[in-house]
C-alpha cells in the first residue's frame, strides 16, 4: 500500500453504494442497497466501513456477517465488480462512487 497518500477530506455529498445479495440482505432488514455517506471523512478503509455497517445498519446477528475484523467465510465481497482479494481486502481505501457488494454463498438445504 502507498504510504504517501494525501489525506484530504472527502468532499461533501460523496457516497458509496453498499449492496447485499444471496441472503445477506436479511441481516440488514431485508434492504438490498444502501447509499452510505462519506462526507467529511478522511481516508476510510473497508475495515472501518465494516464496523460502521455493523454499528449503523446491521439488524441481524453480527456473527453471521463479521468474524473479528473481516467478513465471515462464505460471504463474497466485490469492489466495483472486482473480487476484494485483488483490491487489498479490508485495507482497500474507499473512493467516492465505489460499489461494494456482499454476496452470501451459504444456502440452507
UniProtKB/Swiss-Prot annotation:
Keyword terms, alphabetized: Cytoplasm, Isopeptide bond, tRNA processing, Ubl conjugation pathway
Highest taxon in the source lineage: Eukaryota
Any one biological process term the GO annotation gives: tRNA thio-modification
Gene3D superfamilies recorded: 3.10.20.30
GO annotation, cellular component aspect: cytosol
CDD domains referenced in this protein's UniProt entry, alphabetically: Ubl_Urm1
Primary location class: cytoplasm
Record localization: Cytoplasm
Modification note: C-terminal thiocarboxylation occurs in 2 steps, it is first acyl-adenylated (-COAMP) via the hesA/moeB/thiF part of the MOCS3 homolog, then thiocarboxylated (-COSH) via the rhodanese domain of the MOCS3 homolog.
Keyword field contains rRNA-binding: no
Pathway connected to this protein: tRNA modification; 5-methoxycarbonylmethyl-2-thiouridine-tRNA biosynthesis
InterPro entries: Beta-grasp_dom_sf, Mopterin_synth/thiamin_S_b, Urm1
Task of the protein: Acts as a sulfur carrier required for 2-thiolation of mcm(5)S(2)U at tRNA wobble positions of cytosolic tRNA(Lys), tRNA(Glu) and tRNA(Gln). Serves as sulfur donor in tRNA 2-thiolation reaction by being thiocarboxylated (-COSH) at its C-terminus by MOCS3. The sulfur is then transferred to tRNA to form 2-thiolation of mcm(5)S(2)U. Also acts as a ubiquitin-like protein (UBL) that is covalently conjugated via an isopeptide bond to lysine residues of target proteins.
Family: Belongs to the URM1 family.
Protein name per the record: Ubiquitin-related modifier 1 homolog
Annotated source species: Aedes aegypti
